[in-house]
């Protein structure tokens, strides 16, 4: 695979946990992280994504195809 991949992040505020929860949908239901601020949640998700990509490449597994999701405001 060549070129830069752009993966989705779904970021939601959790009133119960008082944190932002981030899901990485292309990577399955277990690909989640969180942060106490929006910026921290995004940074944590970027770290998780880097680990997922590195792990898949190391194991010789194909990377999931990026998907397009509707944007909401």
Question: Model-flagged regions — what are they?
Answer:
Residues 1-8, 39, 43-73:
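Short, charged, surface-exposed hinge/linker loops at domain edges
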Residues 26, 31, 56:
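Short glycine- and Lys/Arg-enriched binding-loop motifs that mark or flank ligand-binding interfaces
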Residues 12-28:
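Short aromatic-glycine-(Arg/Gly/Cys) micro-motifs in beta-strand/loop hairpins
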Residues 19-21, 32, 43:
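Short acidic, gly/pro-rich beta-turn/loop elements at beta-sheet edges
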Residues 29-40:
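A short, exposed loop/beta-hairpin motif centered on an aromatic-Gly-Thr core
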Residues 3, 10, 14-17, 35:
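Short, positively charged
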């Amino acid at each position: 695979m060549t070129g830069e991949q752009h993966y989705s992040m779904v970021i939601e505020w959790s009133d119960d946990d008082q944190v932002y929860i981030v899901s990485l949908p292309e990577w399955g239901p277990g690909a989640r992280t969180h942060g106490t601020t929006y910026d921290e949640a995004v940074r944590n998700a970027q770290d998780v994504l880097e680990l997922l990509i590195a792990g898949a490449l190391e194991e010789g597994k194909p990377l999931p195809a990026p998907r397009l999701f509707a944007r909401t405001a």
